[in-house]
Amino acid sequence: LKPNQSRYWLNPNITDEASFHQEVHQVCEVYEVYEAAPALYENGIHVHSTDEMTGIQALSHKHEALPMVPGKVERREFEYERHGTSGLIASRHVVTGQIESPLIQPTRTELDFVQHVREVVLLHPEYQHIFITNQLNTHQSESLVRFVIDRGKLGLDEETIGVKGKSGILKSLATRKAFLENLAHLIRFVYTPKHCSWLNQIECWFSILVRRLLNKRSSFSSKEALEERIAQFIVYYNTHLAKPFKWTFDGKLLKV
């Protein structure tokens, strides 16, 4: 027993059995896509794990750290200066482990997300694509629906597409989500259930980014310097470290 230690825990709040079973099905679907990713890749279908990392702070220590000496650990300046924040929209190719088309900037609007998805698709424009992501509203937007229609050359008329909040595919978040999940599309989305960010492999890579670059030892003199360092780290990671994660379902963390 370690009474001095504790950890957060989220108890399930099951108010609707049907919705609960639907979310369980979603977990299984995401898992099945990960398992099938190598075979899908062989058949020209690319699987991407996609999300945003927001509020990345550009902090600089007021003074340089004092190096370790015999008998003393390294001493880092406690006070720091803020130089703004940025963000990152990124996809991780599930089979190759490569970080694809990172969008490093402060904003994360629905148009930003569509821009990122477009750039990822254009890396392999002749193939099909599956994006695993969460149910954020910008991931189920009108702009994304229209991109999938245009890119997939679905040839839908405006009456079928409808008007946001009123009719057709665009009527509601639910109708847009159903359209984006359509198995027949060249570009489709698989959504993780609420409180299941652990299912999204890009979250594990964000943790790598924090440990390797955005840690307490880091110091960034400006927002631009922060963004440049993130871009450089991604290039280094793709060149030297990228590999598929080994998925485990026995309570252990994903292993690189």
Predicted regions and their residues:
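Charge-mixed, compositionally biased segments that are often intrinsically disordered regulatory tracts
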Residues: 1-82, 256
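Short glycine-/polar-rich loops that comprise or flank the Walker A/P-loop
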Residues: 44-45, 127-128, 183-188
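Mobile genetic element proteins and their domesticated derivatives, centered on retroelements
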Residues: 49-51, 91, 97, 117, ...
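Short catalytic/ligand-binding loop motif for oxyanion handling, primarily in non-cytosolic enzymes
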Residues: 56-58, 138-142, 197-201, 254-256
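Electropositive, glycine- and tryptophan-enriched low-complexity nucleic-acid-binding patches
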Residues: 68-130
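RNase H-like polynucleotidyl transferase catalytic core
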Residues: 75-80, 151-201, 218-220
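Acidic/histidine-rich, metal-coordinating catalytic segments
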Residues: 127-140, 164-167
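C-terminal anion-handling pockets and recognition modules
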Residues: 184-196, 203-256
